[in-house]
């Protein structure tokens, strides 16, 4: 009984070889479009050759692509062609952008600002010098006043000491006792808030100086 075992065996088709053939054909069409049809795509490799190279490993990947046509990606000299006007060559690094010239207004403003700062520094130094001179003058005046006050105090102390020595050693004339005592007193009406009020005592001394008490000698 015949079950159809003698039917013709169908040709085996390798999917990898068929895919490579389609890709090579597409690359050839792309090259034809780019070059304007001046060069036709090279014939695609047969399915058996592609299958043999893929399975046998007799050709490298570069040989397989060159045998089947690279579609314009690689020329006969081994260099890649430019596609779409774009180059793969490295672009040189450009230098720094040229410096723009500073506008006239900004340059003028900088010069005026610099001049103002210089004038301000000069004025500040002048004021400092005036303050130093004024402080020195005030200090000299204060020292001079202190020196004069000390000299007057010393002179008054020496005079008072001489008068006290004269009163102790000299003879006292009648009626001049209170006058001599009044000379030892300070009748300047200065009020010392921290001290005692001696205004009444001063008034008594002045009264006795002007109207001394007459001392009657006993017989």
From Swiss-Prot:
Spans annotated as Disordered: 32-136
GO biological process: one example: intracellular protein transport
GO cellular component: cell cortex; clathrin coat of coated pit; clathrin coat of trans-Golgi network vesicle; clathrin complex; clathrin vesicle coat; clathrin-coated vesicle; cytoplasm; mitotic spindle
Keywords tagged on the record: Calcium, Coated pit, Cytoplasmic vesicle, Membrane
Membrane topology: Peripheral membrane protein
Location(s) in or outside the cell: Cytoplasmic vesicle membrane; Membrane, Coated pit
InterPro entries in the cross-refs: Clathrin_L-chain
Region (Involved in binding clathrin heavy chain): 96-158
GO molecular function: clathrin heavy chain binding; structural molecule activity
Keyword Methyltransferase: no
Entry annotated with the keyword Signal: no
Biased composition (Basic and acidic residues): 99-136
Source domain of life: Eukaryota
Pfam families: Clathrin_lg_ch
Cysteine-cysteine disulfides: none
Chief location bin: membrane
Family from the record: Belongs to the clathrin light chain family.
Oligomer status and interactors: Clathrin coats are formed from molecules containing 3 heavy chains and 3 light chains.
UniProt function note: Clathrin is the major protein of the polyhedral coat of coated pits and vesicles.
Protein name as it appears in the record: Clathrin light chain
Organism: Drosophila melanogaster
Name of the gene encoding the protein in the UniProt record: Clc
